[in-house]
Amino acid sequence: MKPTQPHPVIPVNQLRPGMYVIAIASQTGAMEIAQTGLVTTRQQVDVLIRRGVLTVKVDLARSKLPGIAQVISPSPAHSAGSVRPAGSGEGRELKIRRLYQEARELQGKFIRHLKAGEPIDITPLAAVAEEMVDTMFTHGDAMLCLARIRAKDAYLMEHSMNVAILLANFGRYLGLDRSVLKELTLGGLLHDVGKIMTPDEVLNKPGKLTDEEFGVMRQHVVHSYDILSNTAGITPTMLEVAANHHERLDGTGYPQRLKGDQLSLYTRMSGIVDVYDAVTADRVYKQGMQPTQAFRILLKGINQHFDAELVTKFIKCMGVYPVGTLVQLSNQRLAVVMQRNEQQPLKPVVKVIYHTTQRHYLEVQWLDLARNGGQESIESTVDPKEFGINLANFV
């Protein structure tokens, strides 16, 4: 059914090449579209998402996308297992995106003030960390989806954001008190702040570091400790995340070469989370691993680098197919994992988006693999780059 309004407002992640944009309807930043016009590439959509655009107003008459009415207002007919996730909707999605963007902006402001030698106040970041924890309890999967959105040129802030989200998720799974989760989340947001002291030629080197350069890189942990220990409002737990996330069980970590029982629960948690996010991230000099590959790295390091029990629990809390993972279904369609299924981990709720043999995007469909009578199942995980898919458009 065609929308009754000629200029519907849609979430930016529904924007497709062929749609004609006439205005930004809502956003988190101050960016404005220089000129209205036809969207011709997915890269244009990516730019809008990265700059904080949340919704856009589309002109149906001037759009050139076949079946645009169906894209904006999907057909009410659903196959077996089709779902509308509980608590879903544009309002919830926009709220969570705003929270994510607000945290990113506050991170940037904190770092700018540090570099300029200006007074710093963690109160706004502490407030957003508390809101992130609250959201993890109500819409945790949606938060984890945002942790899959990455840009190679923004690694430092995105890595810290993701570590914060992953620590909140891990801590919730372990049953930690909310006050502790808030500290871990804020510690994650600030855990790599000392890298502002690391020379860019070392921090962003497109290749393997020399021994001397690696020594310089290691100093970021000391810098983080020095900065945060002199910042009002920083707790011992937050300091521990920043100072100890590179320590390892066998004493091969840094900077203090702590060993065994010297590594607290929070240190062990932050080490696991930091490595998981780092190896799954795309960098200028390397392609990120898929989550299942990252799990293998963690499992390979148990009892040497990582606590075996905690690694097992981390993998369980993330799920066999972590939220935000692109998977191939048994009918050659690609889907993004959107919600975990703790009772049946192999059957999450997914969002179907693409056909691999016909090589084209599909009308987005939510599908609960536990409720489709076995009609479809996951065959494998897929690297989005193989099909030129940007997950930011679908999570």
PLM region spans:
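Membrane-cytosol interface segments
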Residues: M1-I120, E376-V395
